Amino acid sequence: MHRQFLSSCCQNLFFKFKLLLFEVNQMQYVYIFIGGALGALLRYLISFLNTDGGFPIGTLIANLTGAFVMGLLTALTIAFFSNHPTLKKAITTGFLGALTTFSTFQLELIHMFDHQQFITLLLYAVTSYVFGILLCYVGIKLGGGLS
């Protein structure tokens, strides 16, 4: 009984994956790839602002910029991107997905903890979360005013 259920679930997942890969606009993958490459390149360049053992300003800038732009694009979707969903995916999933980095943020927090930089850790975590939410909200409001 469990094998039959598992087999049915796997077939269903495979069907959905096949549908996504082959029956959806395949150009969106190209646009996401290009957006991802550009976002990764910008993320790499911004990372030079980080210093060894210092405050990770590059990661903070990348993540806060990404939060603002994601909010802005979310609000602008109805007005500007409804006819261009592929472009929206290229920017959000590709560019912003590659630009922002939650995993690096977490690793930097662990590094600060290991080096007993508790004040810096607290400042970085609170700044990232509070300003990330705030900038995303500002982006949504600004985008709503533009649309």
Swiss-Prot record:
Regulation of protein activity: Na(+) is not transported, but it plays an essential structural role and its presence is essential for fluoride channel function.
A GO term from the CC aspect: plasma membrane
Binding positions for Na(+) per the UniProt entry: 97, 100
Pfam families: CRCB (PF02537)
Bilayer-crossing regions: 29-49, 61-81, 90-110, 118-138
Subcellular location: Cell membrane
Similarity comment: Belongs to the fluoride channel Fluc/FEX (TC 1.A.43) family.
NCBIfam families: crcB, PRK14201.1
Protein name (Swiss-Prot/TrEMBL): Fluoride-specific ion channel FluC 1
Recorded name of the encoding gene: fluC1
